[in-house]
Every structure is written in C-alpha cells, then in structure tokens.
Design a protein with these regions (language model features):
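Alpha-helix-loop-beta-strand connector modules within alpha/beta enzyme cores
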Residues: 69-97, 261-263, 401-420
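An alpha-helical appendage that flanks or caps ligand/catalytic pockets
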Residues: 2-18, 151-214, 247-254, 258-380, ...
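N-terminal beta1-alpha1-beta2 module of alpha/beta enzyme domains
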Residues: 1-91, 214-217, 340, 441
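Active-site mouth loops of central-metabolism enzymes
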Residues: 22-37, 100-109, 145-147, 213-226, ...
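Hydrophobic faces of well-ordered beta-strands that scaffold small-molecule active sites
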Residues: 7-11, 54-56, 95-101, 124-130, ...
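Hydrophobic, small-residue-rich alpha-helical packing segments that form membrane-like cores
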Residues: 10-13, 28-37, 74, 84-97, ...
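Conserved, mostly hydrophobic/aromatic
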Residues: 9, 46, 50, 88, ...
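Acidic (Asp/Glu)-rich catalytic clusters
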Residues: 2-4, 47-48, 85-93, 119-125, ...
C-alpha cells in the first residue's frame, strides 16, 4: 500500500544537462541544444519514469562571463521555452511542462496568453516558473542600462502575478456556449474586463484565450531570498530551492510552510522541491568515479566564471587557494550568493574549491551512490520534512537520466514512495493541487 506522503519529482534540465562539462562526457549529446529529437527522447523517458514535470530554465541574455569561459559553455544558446514546450506537449500525454518567464522583462498580457495557450495545447499540463531575472545583462537587451533593483523587481513581480492570474480569469469556464441556432458564440455576462491600473502595470483585458483547463497553470517560484520566500508563500504552488544538506532543507521547509499558515493558505498547497544532483552507480565508489571523471572535464576558467555569476562578483583576481573574502552586495541573486558565502565559511573552503563545486553540481544537494542509498536519502528528506519531493538534476544526458529512471525510480516504487501510474490527467491533479476558483464568476 502506498504511503500517505508520496515524493513529487520534477526534472531540472538544460539541453546538455546542468553540469558545466556534461556535453564532454562520453556518450553525451553535445548538440542537444538545438536537436528536437533529443528533447523528445528526454521527455518521453521522464514520462516513462512517471515524473511529475519537466522544468525548463531560461535566460534572456548570454551569461555574464569572460570569453575564455563563455566559449566553453554549452548553455550559451537554447530554444525559447514557450516555443519548445508546445511541441513537447504533442509527444507526451501526462508529463507536466514548466517554462520560465521573467516578470521584469516581459509584459503580463503576453505571458498570460502564452501559458493559457500551452495549457490548452497540453490538455492541462502547463506550469509557469515566475522569475524576476538575476542576470544583469538581460537589462541591456530590453532598453535599460542597468538591471532593475532587487526589491523593485519583486514588487513588480507581485503585481505582475495579480495581473496574469486576473487575465486567466477573464472568462467563466462555461462562457463559450457556441449556440449554432441562435448564433451566439459566448455569453457576454461571463466575460470580465480586468482594467488593471497599478504602480507598475496598466492592462485592460480581457484575455483573448479561454480560461486554462487547470483554471490557472501551476505557479512555480524559485527564489530563496527573503523577498522570494514571501512571494512564494503568497502565490506559489511549487517552489524550487537549493539547500545542500538536510538541516538547511528542513529550516527552509518550515519557514515557507509557516509563512503560508500565517497567510491562511494550506501548507499542502505548496510543494517544496529542492534541487538534487544525482549520480547513480552499481557501488558508491563507481558513482563517485563518474562524478570525478565529470569534474575533471571542467576547465578552471569555467568554474571561476560560474562562481562569479552565482556571487554576482568577479572572483578571477582573488587568491584561488585562499579563503573567500568578504563579497560586496550586488543586484544579482541574493539567495545564491548567501548560500555560497555561508558554505565557504562553514566548511573552510578555498575559492578554488568553491569554484569546483559550483562548476560541477550547480551548488545543489549531491546524491551520489547506488539506487538503494539514493532512495534512502530521498526517503529521509521526505519523512523528516526537508521536502515534498525533488527537482532532479542529471549529471549528463541521456545516460544520467536513463540511470535514474531505470534504477532509482523502481527502488522508490518498491518502497511505496513514488507512483506507479499517474493519478490524474492534469499537472495539478498529479501534484495534488486544487483547481483555483475564478475570482470573478
């Protein structure tokens, strides 16, 4: 009999995987960025493994790295998520499809329309990852000289969310009567004009897409700063975070769920999915050897550049074999910066060691071992309220994905921790989330 609490599994995937050197690993697909057949194979494998969702991160600029590091990066280019995911919807039936869209460098009408369309095309499997953009270079692609200040980005994001969800509620679920005899296509009493005028946004509406199948696509958030946690507690239904140990995971889980209670939201209406970088082997030693080989393929310039991006500060001129000095505040991601600073101080890491870590597993929790040891750790996190599931990162593709689906998933199922079949038809139903009521009808 299945346990009362079941793991939720998302897949955090970039075309050639998360690890900086994944594209160089033996058997990897180095051309995956623009090879649709590879994406099709990835999502169909995820669906075979009964994953809840495929999550596609996105940036609206090339990463802010020196050219000696940038030229080694396989993530410099990728498909636009909201162009790719509708195509992937056609080759899948159950897998949720979550795309990133920035609230800083988009307009809410565009976002509402695209995600509503994706939800209809996928028969109710869309999710919106709400981000405020951490890459300062994005500003220069949208007519700005400087990135919008962190607090201002989150204030705009809160209003942006209200507008987008309001636009999704433009129509009652039964507005489109399509009466052939009378010639009436929709009931005019069941259309709402939003007419929003706020601090940052002015949007009239209504949306020219029917209400999404799920009511709203699932709302996802990934910020772990104070502002990010509060926004998640108020609005999110899934949150991605990146603690690298159970204690930090439990602390984050309790904090966000506690904020929800204070806001009158059910704690079950938000799923906390920390990132987990998973390497599978027949033995722990074999799994570690895979990780060691992968890490050996990371050029030092790439590791230093990745660390600089995460800290929002160029560390290339620092003593690489010395401790991380005090790093000034920046307008990049505050949660990523703070996590790495805390880790460096706590574990007495040198700048070089920290760069190797970030360039390898993206600063996430590492689960390196056999199917049994990995399942044991996942079970402990779930049972001790460190998470509701995981946003799994694969070390290389397709091999790392195949290892997880073919070896770890059966062990999780054997322990009655994970589904054998999908429970519902929509992403909300599979995540155990309610369908939002229309606020206007």
């Amino acid at each position: 009999m299945a346990r009362a609490r079941q793991l939720r599994l998302g897949a955090f995937m970039r075309p050639v995987s998360i690890h900086t050197a994944a594209w160089r690993y033996p058997g990897a697909f180095p051309d995956a960025n623009f090879n649709f057949a590879h994406y099709q194979g990835f999502v169909q494998t995820l669906e075979r493994g009964r994953f809840d969702a495929f999550f596609m991160a996105d940036h609206l600029a090339v990463m802010n790295m020196p050219m000696n590091a940038l030229q080694r990066s396989a993530t410099v280019t990728s498909f636009d998520p909201l162009t790719l995911l509708p195509a992937l919807a056609v080759v899948t039936k159950h897998l949720g499809l979550i795309a990133t869209a920035s609230t800083t460098y988009n307009d809410p009408y565009h976002v509402a329309r695209k995600f509503a369309s994706l939800d209809h095309i996928s028969n109710g499997r869309a999710g919106w990852n709400v981000v405020t953009s951490a890459n300062p270079r994005e500003a220069m692609n949208f007519g700005r000289e400087e990135h919008v200040e962190h607090g201002e980005r989150y204030r705009r994001a809160r209003e942006f969310y209200d507008v987008v969800t309001g636009l999704w509620d433009s129509w009652a679920d039964d507005a489109f009567i399509r009466d052939v005899e009378t010639g009436i296509y929709f009931d005019s009493a069941k259309m709402h004009v939003l007419d929003h005028k706020g601090e940052h946004l002015s949007v009239r509406g209504p949306l020219n897409v029917a209400r999404p199948i799920q009511g709203w696509p699932v709302i996802v958030q990934a910020g772990a700063s104070e502002a990010g946690r509060q926004l998640a507690a108020e609005t999110a239904e899934v949150i991605f975070n990146s603690p690298n140990n159970l204690t930090d995971g439990q602390r984050f889980y309790a904090d966000v769920k506690g904020r929800m209670a204070a806001l009158g939201r059910s704690r079950d209406h938000l799923k906390v999915l920390p990132g987990a970088f998973v390497v599978v082997g027949d033995t722990v030693a074999e799994a570690r050897a895979k990780k060691t080989l992968l890490d050996s393929l990371v050029h030092p310039d790439s590791g230093i550049a990745s660390l600089s991006v995460q800290l929002g500060h160029d560390v290339s001129g620092l003593d690489l074999d010395g401790p991380l000095p005090e790093i000034p505040e920046s307008n990049a991601s505050k949660s990523s910066r703070q996590k790495l600073v805390t880790m460096a101080q706590r574990d007495h890491m040198t700048v070089r060691q920290l760069a190797q870590y970030v360039g390898g597993s993206f600063g996430a929790l590492e689960l390196i071992g056999t199917p049994v040891t990995i399942a044991e750790e996942m079970e402990e996190w779930l049972e001790t309220e460190g998470c509701d599931g995981f946003n799994v990162m694969f070390p290389y593709l397709p091999g790392g994905l195949d290892d997880f689906v073919d070896r770890v998933v059966p062990e999780l199922q054997r322990r009655e921790l994970f589904r054998r079949e999908y429970e519902g038809a929509t992403l909300r139903e599979n995540l155990g989330l309610p369908r939002p009521q229309n606020r206007f009808f």
